[in-house]
């Protein structure tokens, strides 16, 4: 809140927040997100990989507050980028130069990239309950694969056989539990 109120009329700020902040459904976190959207002062959000800071395992996101941005907002999910390395007793995630540049270019150019970034309007954010999580806006892709009747029948037989085995094991476990319970005595 202090940062928002300290900004000049067209000021900018970058704030590191716990990733839970960008999706919290109530409380001060949501109120701040609502304020940023209603006042149209959000440049974008980058969700970073876990362990990006070696001293904490907390997942963080970077909020880019931009009082001059009245148009679209870029949301980036960089959580799957980077490589985990051992740093003393801690593990940390390190981004390659190319990954860093990809994040910078995607953000600056407001580019939409499948499973990495989305460019959304303030109204889109309102419609998603003020969530700043890029994943909330990704298109769900379903791939259909054509199979023959024989392939279908074989898959169904496999599923049916597996189910039979599981039912049999379940019955055996049920019988064993009943047997154990019957053997319990009060002393």
Residue ranges and their predicted role:
Residues 1-187:
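A conserved structural/catalytic subdomain of Rossmann-like adenosyl-cofactor enzymes
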